[in-house]
């Protein structure tokens, strides 16, 4: 049997022919055997039974290949499903532990008083932190942080620092991302186990809505960028947390927010090492590794890979021309 390239040689012609058969594969096969009967001696040219034997052998060969391809596809899908489920479970567990979730039950006076006290304490802590940053309070050990803040671009000031998953921990939900996908966990504090009929999850190419039926949605906005709806999914973890998995269309981009109404994260502080490089193809992986290297070099004030190449070329040129004086030369 021929190789894959040989097999695909006539695909264009056969596809055009198949498209003209309204009866589908059955009509196409009938046309092919009609051609063999009318234009060749396939059925009568050899020994008795040879034509049938050839047909059976050919069918068995391609049937085995088709069954093998189907098994491999199912195995890949099962592996991907299991990995997504494990990732969603881990994210849900973290969200359940770290995020209080939206309150949908009526608070007692005691709970309301305690909640207000926590809010006031948080505001005091934030004001204290602002004073430290503005220099109105002296704080030992803050010099390095202040220097780092000074070095930050003006346009990046005020942006959130990414969480360990290169996303954001927000009051009502948290999300993480890799270059190719994004995972979201929305915890709900309810007195019953959530079921599919209790929640509303609507994933569109550029819009996402998540919430409980009869309640205002927790998320209802335009996504930062487009996603593959057919490869995205959602499920309920532990009866309390809704997790959503989104497949990005642009797999060479870090999102700075989930939906456009969210606060931005500083993508310059993203750590690509937290992403699964093993999931990327070789070309994309090499590009990401280069990005990681250049990011580390910049953070240490060292030249990037491109700058190093330029320096090496310049050094070779200078070594080859010792008679030239480069002491007053300026290089960009």
Swiss-Prot record:
Residues 145-154 have a biased composition (Acidic residues). One of its GO terms (biological process) is mitotic metaphase chromosome alignment. Reversibly phosphorylated on serine residues during the M phase of the cell cycle. Phosphorylation on Ser-275 and Ser-327 is necessary for correct formation of mitotic spindles and chromosome separation during mitosis. Phosphorylated by PLK and other kinases. The modification Phosphothreonine is found at residue 108. It holds the Pfam family Nudc_N. The keyword Phosphoprotein applies. A motif (Nuclear localization signal) lies at residues 68-74. It is found in: Cytoplasm, Cytoskeleton; Nucleus; Cytoplasm, Cytoskeleton, Spindle; Midbody. Residues 168-259 form the CS domain. Its main location: cytoplasm. The keyword Cell division applies. Residues 60-129 form a coiled coil. Residues 75-97, 121-131 have a biased composition (Basic and acidic residues). Induction: Up-regulated by prolactin in T-cell lymphoma. Maximum level of expression occurs at the G1/S phase transition of the cell cycle. The modification N6-acetyllysine is found at residue 240. Plays a role in neurogenesis and neuronal migration. Necessary for correct formation of mitotic spindles and chromosome separation during mitosis. Necessary for cytokinesis and cell proliferation. This is Nuclear migration protein nudC. The gene is Nudc.
């Amino acid at each position: 049997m021929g190789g894959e390239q040989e097999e695909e040689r006539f695909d264009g012609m056969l596809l055009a022919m198949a498209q003209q058969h309204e009866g589908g594969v059955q009509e196409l096969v009938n046309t092919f055997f009609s051609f063999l009967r009318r234009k060749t001696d396939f059925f009568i040219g050899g020994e008795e039974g040879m034509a049938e034997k050839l047909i059976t052998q050919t069918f068995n060969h391609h049937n085995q290949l088709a069954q093998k391809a189907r098994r491999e596809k199912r195995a890949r899908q099962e592996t991907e499903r299991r990995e997504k489920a494990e990732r969603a479970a881990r994210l849900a567990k973290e969200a359940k532990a770290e995020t209080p979730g939206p309150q949908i039950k009526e608070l007692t006076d005691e709970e309301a008083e305690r909640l207000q006290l926590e809010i006031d304490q948080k505001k005091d802590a934030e004001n204290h932190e602002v004073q430290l940053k503005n220099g109105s309070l002296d704080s030992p050990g803050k010099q390095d942080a202040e220097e780092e803040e000074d070095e930050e671009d003006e346009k990046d000031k005020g942006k959130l620092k990414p969480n360990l998953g290169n996303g954001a921990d927000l009051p009502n939900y948290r999300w993480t991302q890799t270059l190719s996908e994004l995972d979201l966990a929305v915890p709900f504090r309810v007195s019953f186990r959530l079921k599919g009929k209790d929640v509303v999850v609507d994933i569109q190419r550029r819009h996402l809505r998540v919430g409980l039926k009869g309640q205002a949605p927790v998320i209802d906005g335009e996504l930062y960028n487009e996603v593959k709806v057919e490869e995205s999914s959602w499920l309920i973890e532990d009866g309390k947390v809704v997790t959503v998995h989104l497949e990005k269309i642009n797999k060479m981009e870090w999102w700075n927010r989930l939906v456009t109404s969210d606060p931005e994260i500083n993508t310059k502080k993203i750590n690509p090492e937290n992403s699964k490089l093993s999931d990327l193809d070789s070309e994309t992986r090499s590009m990401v590794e280069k990005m990681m290297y250049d990011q580390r070099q910049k953070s240490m004030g060292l030249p990037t890979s491109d700058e190093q190449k330029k320096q090496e070329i310049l050094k070779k040129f200078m070594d080859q021309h010792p008679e030239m004086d480069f002491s007053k030369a300026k290089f960009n």
